Curated annotation (Swiss-Prot):
GO terms for cellular component: plasma membrane. The gene is ccmA. It is a peripheral membrane protein. This is Cytochrome c biogenesis ATP-binding export protein CcmA. It comes from Xanthomonas euvesicatoria pv. vesicatoria (strain 85-10) (Xanthomonas campestris pv. vesicatoria). Residues 12-214 form the ABC transporter domain.
């Protein structure tokens, strides 16, 4: 007797997910999923709810309607925060700490064991030699690179990236694409928001388009 093949559930799935603010709909209801080894590219104009969607998924905003599943199981808010690494518009860095101190601090703050040494992460994002530089001395692009180093250190399998190409030059955009590709090759997944004309990362990509509420 041939046993049926068992297909692994999606790394993340959303069912009838919706969010409103002051009784005005922001997005939804949405149904989508992302498998291990692929990226979900979330597109839409400003005001379409891209950032809000990622904040809901990350557990930073309450789920009003719908369901979020991780590996086929309904995920509570705290479970999602441990499973996901969120890179938002604000880098979330300590201005009076050095780049290296920030990475050590943030790893300890979340109680996560980094998958690499912080110094190696700085080199990967092009900040070798800036270990002792204070964050307040960095340019916007350098701060974005430091936030990318923090992302790289996270063991979370799902990356939530809100406009990751913002404040980056062409080399920085290439860096983001390489990081996403490496993360997916390791069995991770990524949700990436964009409203610009940037090329999608060179990986297996699923598309989700949001439209601003009327």
């Amino acid at each position: 007797m041939i046993e049926p093949l068992h297909t692994a559930p999606p790394l993340l799935a959303a069912h009838a997910l919706a969010f409103s603010r002051n009784e005005e709909p922001v997005f939804g209801p949405l149904d989508f999923h992302v498998d291990a080894g692929e990226a979900l590219l979330v597109q839409g104009d400003n005001g379409a709810g891209k950032t809000t969607l990622l904040r809901v998924l990350a557990g930073l905003l309450h789920v009003e309607r719908g369901q979020i599943q991780i590996d086929g199981k309904t995920a509570k808010r705290g479970d999602r925060s441990r499973f996901m690494a969120y890179l938002g518009h604000l880098p979330g860095l300590k201005a009076d700490l050095s780049t290296l101190e920030n990475l050590h601090f943030l790893c300890g703050l979340h109680g996560r064991r980094a998958k690499q040494m912080p110094g190696s992460a700085l080199a990967i994002v092009g900040l070798a030699g800036y270990e002792d530089a204070l964050v307040r001395q960095l340019s916007a692009g350098q701060r974005k690179r430091l936030a990318l180093a923090r992302l790289w250190l996270s063991p979370a399998p799902l990356w939530l990236l809100d406009e990751p190409y913002a404040n980056l030059d062409l080399d920085g955009i290439t860096l983001v694409n390489r990081m996403i590709s490496a993360h997916l090759r390791g069995g991770g997944a990524a949700l990436v928001t964009t409203h610009g004309a940037y090329a999608a990362p060179p990986v297996r990509t699923r598309m989700l388009t949001l439209e601003a509420a009327a």
